[in-house]
């Protein structure tokens, strides 16, 4: 191997170039690469965190939907129960009103029957007196007439 001044000069230039690169170019380059690696790592961590948050949010949404369905079903069941109770109450009120109307109609019919019997007794008494009067062909005085009517009413 031939070692001459050119080789030493090239070595000096190489070491000067190496020193300049190591001193001025390499640190910013390493810093830029480190920053880039950090940004990539932060981005991946943020993506993982976002994915976990999305999964958690989906679970919360599913839970909220299940609760809403349960609450909706409960409200429907409560409404149906209230409607059934209201229908039963209306039915009971209608039955009570019907029973009251029937009792009132029976009482009224009984009163009409009683009044009709009284009227019939009065008419029978008058007819009996008229019949007796025609048979006897005479007029009965007022006191005897009243006594006869009362006696006929009592007998009928």
UniProtKB/Swiss-Prot annotation:
Pfam families: ATP-synt_B (PF00430). Keywords: ATP synthesis, Cell inner membrane, Cell membrane, CF(0), Hydrogen ion transport, Ion transport, Membrane, Transmembrane, Transmembrane helix, Transport. It is found in: Cell inner membrane. GO terms for molecular function: proton-transporting ATP synthase activity, rotational mechanism; proton-transporting ATPase activity, rotational mechanism. HAMAP family: ATP_synth_b_bprime. Belongs to the ATPase B chain family. This is ATP synthase subunit b.
